């Protein structure tokens, strides 16, 4: 019998293409593992904010007394973070319990000529754990896109689509409407769907998909926000949806979380219509206590954010300019080569007075010197570090006693930084 570390190694060592769209492999894995898919699922797609939205909804449902499951990606520091039961990462005993049948099923498929990806194995592992642990409800985050994503085997009780932006364009398309069409692929027949505020073209894509599937559609708009006051550690917001939600405290910082929380409230209202018991108190307490690491996360005088695409980096820039307007800032950053775009470079230049670049521990990483050169060409004062440890030390030296270190560029980089800072993942 394999232990947790061996199971995780087997998952990471599976078919090395890393990403493959389709459903059959996950269905075959689940069939071989005798997983019945009985757990009620909320399925969430989107470019940005889907992880935060999932985390907030899970926190609310847990406060309401439900036994919850949560599946997200990628992880920051440890694989087990991706699969949570009642808010806690999958423990070693459950990893062994559900991981061994998973590895055996994958080996049988390889012997039959099929090859599974790490994401397919992770999806099957999560669904097996939710089923085996008799979760009352689980929230499943799409990996990429939606229409062809391996998570799209689920038959959810509710779908949600968060903010749409330009990311994964080689796979999903070069326009917001094309990307929205891929995200809308999670919409199922007669299944309610909640959609984040969006531009008219994107709203039209969602409306057409919902009509095709006879899915009750709730398209949100910023008109429902009655009052909002942001600070460096969260926000206090009032909304008018099916009911008025007064002075909702959000524990996740950033103005973008106001719209994510709006989606959560609309999802709560829809679940209530389906018969789920979710008291107002559970909603207020759940949103006020949500923890989602590396999303504008404060660690002393350091601010860690997983921003890794134009929309995310712009949200980070807006946050530091609004909440830290007179604060000297040092940026510590590492990015993936296939993610970096011109808009991101300009926004990173605006975030800080001094920039230190590092090379993330990822085969897709952009070399730190190449990154620093690109920033300098756009007017920044940037320098490359040879390692994360060297970069962190240099950022601290530049920050001195009065500056804030802002760390961003990649979730992989953010996870490595949390480890370097001694932050626990459990």
Where are the model-predicted features located?
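Active-site-proximal loop/hinge segments that shape catalytic or ion-binding/gating pockets
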Residues: 410
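Acidic, Mg2+-coordinating active-site environments of NTP-dependent enzymes
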Residues: 109-110, 134-141, 156-247, 261, ...
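Nucleotide phosphate-binding/pyrophosphate-handling subdomain across enzymes
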Residues: 38-40, 132, 137-142, 149-160, ...
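C-terminal helical cap/extension that packs against the catalytic core
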Residues: 199-218, 233, 302, 310, ...
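Beta-strand->loop->alpha-helix junctions that form or flank phosphate-binding loops
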Residues: 71, 196-197, 209-231, 250-255, ...
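Short Gly/Thr/Asp-enriched flexible loops that form oxyanion-binding sites at enzyme active sites
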Residues: 57, 147-157, 418-421
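ATP-dependent carboxylate-amine ligase catalytic core
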Residues: 23, 27-37, 63-154, 170, ...
């Amino acid at each position: 019998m394999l232990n947790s570390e061996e199971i995780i190694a087997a998952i990471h060592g599976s078919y090395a293409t890393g990403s493959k769209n389709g459903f059959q492999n996950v269905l075959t894995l689940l069939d071989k593992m005798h997983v019945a898919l009985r757990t009620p699922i909320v399925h969430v797609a989107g470019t940005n904010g889907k992880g935060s939205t999932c985390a907030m909804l899970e926190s609310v449902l847990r406060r309401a007394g439900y036994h919850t499951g949560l599946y997200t990606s990628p992880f920051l520091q440890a694989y087990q973070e991706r699969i949570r039961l009642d808010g806690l990462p999958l423990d070693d005993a459950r990893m062994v319990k559900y991981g061994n049948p998973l590895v055996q099923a994958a080996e049988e498929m390889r012997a039959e000529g099929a090859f599974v990806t790490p994401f397919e194995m992770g999806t099957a592992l999560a669904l097996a754990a939710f089923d085996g642990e008799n979760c009352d409800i689980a929230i499943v985050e799409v990996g990429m896109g939606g229409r062809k994503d391996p998570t799209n085997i689920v038959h959810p009780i509710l779908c949600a689509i968060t903010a749409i932006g330009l990311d994964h364009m080689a796979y999903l398309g070069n326009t917001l409407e094309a990307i929205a069409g891929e995200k809308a692929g999670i919409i199922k027949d007669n299944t309610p769907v909640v959609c984040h505020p969006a531009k008219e073209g994107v709203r039209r894509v969602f409306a057409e998909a919902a009509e095709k599937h006879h899915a009750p559609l709730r398209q949100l708009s910023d008109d429902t926000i009655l009052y909002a006051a942001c600070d460096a550690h969260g926000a206090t917001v009032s909304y008018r949806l099916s009911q008025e939600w007064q002075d909702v405290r959000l524990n996740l910082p950033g103005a973008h979380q106001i719209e994510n929380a709006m989606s959560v409230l609309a999802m709560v209202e829809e679940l209530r219509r389906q018969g789920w018991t979710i008291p107002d108190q559970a909603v207020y307490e759940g949103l006020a206590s949500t923890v989602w690491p590396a999303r504008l996360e404060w660690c002393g005088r350091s601010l860690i954010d997983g921003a890794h695409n134009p929309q995310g980096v712009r949200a980070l820039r807006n946050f530091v300019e609004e909440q830290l307007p007179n604060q000297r800032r040092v940026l510590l950053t590492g990015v993936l080569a296939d993610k970096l775009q011109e808009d991101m470079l300009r926004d990173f230049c605006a975030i800080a007075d001094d920039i230190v670049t590092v090379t993330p521990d990822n085969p897709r990483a952009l070399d730190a010197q190449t990154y620093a050169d690109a920033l300098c060409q756009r007017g920044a004062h940037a320098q490359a570090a040879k390692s994360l440890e060297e970069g962190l030390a240099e950022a601290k030296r530049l920050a001195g006693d009065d500056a804030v270190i802002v760390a961003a560029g990649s979730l992989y980089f953010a996870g490595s930084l949390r480890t370097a800072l001694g932050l626990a993942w459990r």
